[in-house]
């Protein structure tokens, strides 16, 4: 049960284990799932947020239903690379999930993925597809989750999660030392 970098997450997956991408918003959680070969991300749904416990139960059910073993969670880093309140909220949600393995029936693992501009990119694509505003509003969160997960899958296929890319390798306390506190705090 840990927060890992992307390559460690892949190494910990059981054979044919799937990943689920999350786009955590204030009102909804967009969900996407990978194929067993970790090549393609598909949008699968949205959870309307209520209370953490209910959100976590719905997420656990979605993971079990799709044989998902680990999560790639979009981290809304500021444009200058700093982490603001939204990142703190995402990290806290992830930390709380990891404290409840009984919900999942296994110990889930999480990797963060820099999601800067993911929703904007998805909205531009959907406008290009001539989707109505109403339809875009209905699917934007799960499409953003698929965009986030696909970026992570593409990185995994490259076999390189080196610092400087989009793979956020910071641990729970925001540094890269793998320990609680006392790290460099710098990330990449």
UniProtKB/Swiss-Prot annotation:
EC number: 3.1.-.-
Biased composition (Acidic residues): 166-188
Swiss-Prot/TrEMBL keywords: Cytoplasm, Hydrolase, Nuclease, Ribosome biogenesis
Pfam families: RuvX
Gene Ontology MF terms in the entry: nuclease activity
Location(s), subcellular: Cytoplasm
Matching CDD domains: YqgF (cd16964)
Function description: Could be a nuclease involved in processing of the 5'-end of pre-16S rRNA.
Protein name: Putative pre-16S rRNA nuclease
Organism whose genome encodes this protein: Rhodospirillum centenum (strain ATCC 51521 / SW)
């Amino acid at each position: 049960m840990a927060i890992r970098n992307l390559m460690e997450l892949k190494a910990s997956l059981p054979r044919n284990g799937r990943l689920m991408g999350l786009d955590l918003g204030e009102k909804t959680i967009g969900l996407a799932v990978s194929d067993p070969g970790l090549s393609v991300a598909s949008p699968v749904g949205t959870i309307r947020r209520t209370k953490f416990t209910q959100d976590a139960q719905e997420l656990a059910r979605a993971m079990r239903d799709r044989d998902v073993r680990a999560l790639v969670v979009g981290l809304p880093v500021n444009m200058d690379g700093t982490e603001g309140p939204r990142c703190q909220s995402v990290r806290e949600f992830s930390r709380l999930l990891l404290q409840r393995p009984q919900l999942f029936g296994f110990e889930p693992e999480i990797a963060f993925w820099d999601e800067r501009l993911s929703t904007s990119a998805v909205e531009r694509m959907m406008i290009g597809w001539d989707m109505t505003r109403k339809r875009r509003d209905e699917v934007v969160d799960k499409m953003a989750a698929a965009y986030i997960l696909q970026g992570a899958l593409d990185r995994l296929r490259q076999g390189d999660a080196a610092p400087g890319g989009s793979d956020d390798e910071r641990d729970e306390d925001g540094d890269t030392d793998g320990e609680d506190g006392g790290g460099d705090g710098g990330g990449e």
